[in-house]
C-alpha cells in the first residue's frame, strides 16, 4: 500500500501539474512518477496519476479516495466548480494550499528509508508512460468528448441558461438520466466502458457506488412508476433534446398513449433545440414525426415521436433509446412492437408511467417487481413499514417517517384525500401518491393463489364420516389469542381448533373458529373467554367423539395473569383432558400455562400460506362456531382474512405478515396460523395444569 510519506511528493507533483497551462487534464501532464515499484512485473500496476505501484493497490479504496480529493478536477466541468444539481461532491477548491502535517524529524527519517523513485528501471518507466498515454487517449476520445458535452449541457440546462429558470433533479429524474447516459456509454464505447463509467461517477455523486452496481444502468429495460404531476415528461423532453444536440449517431424513439401527448412532446423538443442550439442544424419532418439534428462531419441524431394507436409506426425502425410514456395505458396491441426492441443488441426501453389500480390491464408494469433483474423503480409517499397505519387512519396523507418528502409543488392534506376518495375509493393512494400496495388486492400479486382459496372454500371434508374420522388424530389443537375489550371495531379474541391426519401431520383440518368480543368490561374477562373456548371444544367433541385430548396454547403477550387464569378455567371445565403450552419464568424455575408469541409468527404465517397453496389445509363441513355462525359462514369469514394476507419487508431482509383490513381485524387468522403451527411442527411440549 502507499506510505504516508509519499503524500508530500504526490502533492508536489499535483501542484506543478495543476499550475501548468496545458491542454492535458490535471496531473496527466506530469512526466515523472511519484512512486516506482520495481518488483516483479506481474505484481506491479502502472497508475497514471501516481506511478508504478504494487498491484494490490488496485483494490485499495484509500488510493481511490486520495486521487479523488487531491487529483485533477473532473474533466467534464468547464470550471473548477462542482455540480450540486447532480448530487456531486463538493470540489476541493485549493489543493495547492493543502499543508502536510509531518514533523521534520519524521520526514527526514522516512526520506532516508524511502529513497526517491528509481527512474533507471526503463521497463517500469515505460509502463507508467503508457498508462499516462492511455489515460490521455481516453480524454481525447470523440465519444468521451461528446459525453462530456452532454453533462455540461445538462448542467447548463438545470442552472437556467436554457429555460431562464433553475431546476433541480428529483431522485427518480436523476435515475432516468443515469439509465439513459450510462447505457449510451456502454454501446458507444465498448472497450473503455468501465473506465468511462469510473470517470463520470463524480459528476453525479456516485463515488461510493461500486462498478458492479453501475452496471445496473446497462439493463435492456427499466421501469419507473411515478405519481401524477411529478415531471415525468419534462425530464424525458430534456434528455432527448440534450442527447440530440450533443451526441452523434443516436436514434431515439418516443411512444405516447395519446396523440396530443406525442404532439406536445414533439413541439417541445423542437422548441428546445431551436432556441438553445443552432436552429440551422435542426430538421423537422412532420409527416413522419421525426426531428434530425445535424452534426458537422458526423452522423446525425434523430428522434421519432409516435403513438400507440399506430402500432406499426415504429416497426422497421432502429432505436438506441425508446421512451414509452404512460406505459401502463399503452394499447396492448402495440406492446409486441415495443417489446421487439428488447432483441436489438444496442437498444434500451425505458417505461415511465403513473400508477393506476383501477384494473389489471392498466397496472401490468407492477408485475415486474418479481423480475430477476431489478427493473422496477417505484416512487411512493408511504413506506412498507407504515403502510398498515396509512390504511387505518383516514387523516394520514404521507409516511410518518422522515425518509420521504413531498415536493413543494404537490398539495396533500386530509381534505384532499377525503374528497378524492369520494370520487373513487383508493384514488388518492394510487393516482396521487404512487402507492402500489393496493394492486395486491387485485390478482396482480397474491400471497395466496385464487385457485387455492377456491379449493379451501368448496372442497370441505366430511369429518362426520366414520372412515374419515378413523384417519384423524385423537388430539385437538386449540390456540387462544385473547383480547380484553368489548369494542367490536377493535381486535377481539381469536380462537381456532384444528386436528391433523394421523398418518400425515402436515395435513390439517379446521374444526372450529371463534371471534369473541366481551359483553362488558368487568372483572370476569378471563372467565368469559375461557367459557367461549370450553363451549367450542364441547361442540367439537360432540360431533367428533374420536377425540381423546385437547392441546391448548393461550397467548400471554397482552396479559400474562389473565392468560394463566384462562388456562386454569379451561383445565377445570373442559370435557376432555387438557394439556397446555407452558412458559418458564426467567427469575425462577416455575412454568406458567401460557404461550409468549415471539419471532415464530412469521414462520407460522409462511407455513400456513404454503399449506393453503398446496391444499394441505382443509375445513370440515361442520366447522363449529358459536360467535360467527349466526351472521356468516365461519370458513368464508376466515377466507376473507386469508385474502388480505400481505407481506411487509423488514430492514433485516425478512418479512412479517398481516391480514388486517380497515373494517376487519385478523384475530381469527392469527389464531388459525398458530394452531396450524402447533399441530404441524410437533415440537412444543404440553403439560397439564392440575
UniProtKB/Swiss-Prot annotation:
Gene Ontology cellular-component annotations: host cell nucleus
Q: What is its main location?
A: host cell
Report the domain of life of the source organism.
Viruses
Extent of motif Walker B motif: 321-326
Give a GO molecular function annotation for the protein: hydrolase activity
Compartments annotated for it: namely: Host nucleus
Q: What Enzyme Commission number does this protein have?
A: 3.1.-.-
Q: What is this protein called?
A: Tripartite terminase subunit 3
Identify the species of origin. Epstein-Barr virus (strain B95-8) (HHV-4)
